[in-house]
Amino acid sequence: MIKPLRTTRKARAALAAAAVTGCLVALSPSAGATATAAAAPPGRVAVDVASVNGSGCRPGSATVAVAPDNSAFTVTYSEYLASAGGGAAATEGRKNCLLSLLVHVPQGFTYAVSHVDYRGYGKLEPGAIGTQKASYYFQGMSQTANRTHQFHGALDDNWQVTDTTGIEALVFAPCGEQRNFNINTELRAEVGTSDKNKTSYMTVDSTDGSISSVYHFSWKQCPVRR
């Protein structure tokens, strides 16, 4: 689902702080968790950046924060922009970022990411094309969801896309194991049929922290070992 947004800087900050609706992955549920979703666990949930690679996110340009109620975590980028036309180099038309995260959860719980909200800004000349892609997977597991959203010029506005998967299709981290959660995103800008002398761009970056990607947790309790 694609929603252009018209917001002020203050409104964007409020929007980024709010819980919203959004993503992930598929195939069969992981073994070792009970069948029904649980409330967010008490105690501290922490998300650490294990590594960051890609043309859209040099080290230090992506930050992560966990919601106080353990319902979600946010990723904020500061330099993630793809551009085309107007003399931009061909390499500027595609940017990517691979984040590998360590998610520390209270004992007895496991998690999946049930939905994700991506936000950014697009300036596309008439005929230009922008693309946002994302996939997610746990370290050592093959389950990967690929989601693609396209935007067509003319566009000069904030944008939002939401990726979501039903609870019956979620993939949970194996109980009792620490596996990195990997997020692979891509941003493209293409001239298309637009005037190649004019610049078009797509961004998910935020210089003031007002635009973040929001990853919503789904929790399950692990069976008690006897």
Task: Write out the residue ranges for each language-model feature.
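Extracellular and analogous surface-interaction loops
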Residues: 102-110, 171-175, 218-223
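An exposed acidic His-Trp-rich patch
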Residues: 114-168
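Generic short beta-strand segments
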Residues: 76-84, 116-121, 184-190
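N-terminal leader/pro-regions and domain N-caps
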Residues: 6, 10-13, 34-86
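Secretory targeting and sorting signals
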Residues: 1-34
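Proprotein-processing/basic-patch segments
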Residues: 189-226
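Cysteine-clustered segments with highest specificity for TGF-beta superfamily mature ligands
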Residues: 74-76, 158-203
